[in-house]
Amino acid sequence: MVRGIRGAITVEEDTPEAIHQATRELLLKMLEANGIQSYEELAAVIFTVTEDLTSAFPAEAARQIGMHRVPLLSAREVPVPGSLPRVIRVLALWNTDTPQDRVRHVYLREAVRLRPDLESAQ
């Protein structure tokens, strides 16, 4: 069975370093929150960035932490007027039998505003 784990984080500036650091932080917290022990458990990871983030691909950061064999995709988020700026979003597809209600989604920094309904928004 495949489950989706959602996450998002904001960055203060559009630099490769900021995007890579935030992406690594978010991915590692998503894995930890869900008890994922090996990247082999991941079917794929999809990243989106808001249109104001253009200096780096989030997928590069995933490779930096060892996700060399996980299919990765970076794309641009829909530019909705008034939406939160400088956001990196993630959808990780996880091969697991974990029930849907036990999957922990992770929202960090200003991105907690995107999902105030979730306990795991930190």
Curated annotation (Swiss-Prot):
Mind listing the GO molecular function terms for this protein?
A: chorismate mutase activity
Q: Indicate where this protein resides in the cell.
A: Cytoplasm
Family annotation (CDD domains): AroH
Q: Which InterPro entries match?
A: Chorismate_mutase_AroH (IPR008243), RutC-like_sf (IPR035959)
**One GO BP annotation of this record:** amino acid biosynthetic process
| Enzymatic reactions | chorismate = prephenate
* Sites where the protein binds prephenate: 6, 89, 107
Q: How does it assemble?
A: Homotrimer.
Question: What is the protein's name according to its record?
Answer: Chorismate mutase AroH
Organism equals Thermus thermophilus
Which gene name belongs to this protein? Answer: aroH
